[in-house]
Every structure is written in C-alpha cells, then in structure tokens.
Amino acid sequence: WSLNREVLDPNNLEVVDDYTCTSCHSNSDAADMPQLPAGQLDLGDGPSPDEPLHFNAYRELLFPDNEQELVNDALVDVLVDSGEVLEDEEGNPILDAEGNVQPIMVTVPVQASMSVNGARASNFFDVFAEGGAHHDFLTPSELRLIAEWLDVGGQYFNNPFDAPED
C-alpha cells in the first residue's frame, strides 16, 4: 500500500499528483503530523494494535473497526450516546457530581471493506471501477491479484508452518 504512485509532469518531472495509498490512508501526513485516514481506512505499515502478528492494513481491510476522529492532534474513537444511562444494581440511575444522569457512550462501528467470502462480497473494488473515486489507481493486475486472494479466503499465513500455534 506504500508503493510510490506519484504522477510526474513529463516536461519538468515535478510531482503533479500522488496516488500512493498511504498518502491519504494513514494516520500521519507527509510532515508526520496526525491525520484522519481517508475513508476511516488506515493502510499504514507496521503491526496491528489489535493483533500484533498481523500488519495493520490487513486488519483494517478485513475486520470491523471503530470510527475515529482527530481531537487535539490525536486520533480517538468516536463515541455516541447509546440512549441508556449508568444504573446501580437496583436499576436506579447513577448521578454525576452535578446531579446529572451519566449516559453510556458506545463506539461507532465501521465495516470492513474486504471480505474473506470473496471479491464479489467485498465493497473494496467499487472505488476502483469505471467512474469510481480511485479508478486507475491500481493496475488491472493488482486488482486481479487482490480479487484472487480474497476468493481463496484472504489468508494471512499461507504456509501452515508459519501460522502461530495459538
């Protein structure tokens, strides 16, 4: 996902556009400042905080995640009111120091864009179709390789001897 996909002006070789996936889909920008990954999809390198044996992008693409927002230069999960309030064991609302009920806050789920049920079950390819926001960002060969990988189950460890024992 971090493959350089800069588009250069043929006359002066200046960068006119950059379709590198991680330039938009990562949690930091080119100046290493925090940014909200485009589409809530972080394709950055490195281990996943959810499963250190997996790369971050693998988890982001194939597993549900929480919607995030940028607050004071930090990425935090978006929390919304569930409509319920904190209660004691007898069902009475627990009040805060000011006498207000305390709402129960929950995260906002973001569905995975890929599915191990195959390429056709994945929303991932929609943005690469004709007229899509990412049309021509990946080559037909790259898209075919991803589709075939999903069609065989999107395995992380293809060699059973490399898979962790747990």
Protein language model regions, located:
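Aromatic- and Gly/Pro-enriched helix-to-coil junctions and flexible linker segments
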Residues: 1-166
